[in-house]
Amino acid sequence: MAQTPAFNKPKVELHVHLDGAIKPETILYYGRKRGIALPADTPEELQNIIGMDKPLSLPEFLAKFDYYMPAIAGCREAVKRIAYEFVEMKAKDGVVYVEVRYSPHLLANSKVEPIPWNQAEGDLTPDEVVSLVNQGLQEGERDFGVKVRSILCCMRHQPSWSSEVVELCKKYREQTVVAIDLAGDETIEGSSLFPGHVKAYAEAVKSGVHRTVHAGEVGSANVVKEAVDTLKTERLGHGYHTLEDATLYNRLRQENMHFEVCPWSSYLTGAWKPDTEHPVVRFKNDQVNYSLNTDDPLIFKSTLDTDYQMTKNEMGFTEEEFKRLNINAAKSSFLPEDEKKELLDLLYKAYGMPSPASAEQCL
């Protein structure tokens, strides 16, 4: 029997990776079609090999992508299809608005140096990847009734890609793209300050491109500080280690910084140690501005309900808190103000709450 959802009302998700949210069936289909060897023959076997049941180190987690990304990257049909199927997945999660992120370069096999996943050079450029993802998302939006926007990721270990990422954000800003992100291994010393990333984020500020950064997931509070002060981020991906620096934490609370929290992910990646209080409990108790997100549901064998069940059953989260955090997620989304107001009105109505005059103030 299916589990009753922990929060059976419309939800907003702001932190989920497209390449970590692919159906195993789709991976197998393109592996076979393209003659690319995969470590399993059935969706169930593949899910178990790619998926995680217990915490792994960051390198072990990242190695999961090596199993299946060669089946998808460099293939136009596959790139568009995973975007379309992503929207279907989110409709099943009860999500009404989602921002999905990905690195265009990691799905390309042309005009990208180095070519990822040991692919031979082909003719799918990062620019065309964005166009294909946009098409898939827009078709999914139409068919499944979920509003979707996208975020393009710079990669910490590849600062040479970042200038193109911000230019693609500008080029496709009218077609789903709303922001830039910095993802990858934040333990790479000084990677927030690599000139390629700093210049791209400065250009984003100048051009009015919204900004988020993975920081303080496994990295220190100092990485968070760099994201806020140097990269001028508007939101933090994870941000858990902010709590190590009380001055920084209090400042970010006052500035109403939004934390994109991924509870189940944080357990499986070792970002959170289960014998300690989860940072999201502190965020809840302090009434901080945060959201709940899946991060990489394919690898974590999860749905958005997994994160809601975890916080409800193990951390005492209430329906009122779930409403509050989703309203804050909507307010912290990268939608233009008129669309943000529409989203908020939808949530207030669904939650049986009066709609305040202004959507500016977070709860």
UniProtKB/Swiss-Prot annotation:
Oligomer and partners: Interacts with DPP4 (via extracellular domain). Interacts with PLG (via Kringle 4 domain); the interaction stimulates PLG activation when in complex with DPP4.
Subcellular location: Cell membrane; Cell junction; Cytoplasmic vesicle lumen; Cytoplasm
Gene Ontology CC terms: anchoring junction; cytoplasmic vesicle lumen; cytosol; external side of plasma membrane; lysosome
Gene that this polypeptide is encoded by: ADA
Protein name, per record: Adenosine deaminase
Binding site for Zn(2+): H15, H17, H214, D295
GO biological process, one term: nucleotide metabolic process
First-level EC class: hydrolase
Annotated function: Catalyzes the hydrolytic deamination of adenosine and 2-deoxyadenosine. Plays an important role in purine metabolism and in adenosine homeostasis. Modulates signaling by extracellular adenosine, and so contributes indirectly to cellular signaling events. Acts as a positive regulator of T-cell coactivation, by binding DPP4. Its interaction with DPP4 regulates lymphocyte-epithelial cell adhesion. Enhances dendritic cell immunogenicity by affecting dendritic cell costimulatory molecule expression and cytokines and chemokines secretion. Enhances CD4+ T-cell differentiation and proliferation.
Lineage, opening ranks: Eukaryota, Metazoa, Chordata, Craniata, Vertebrata
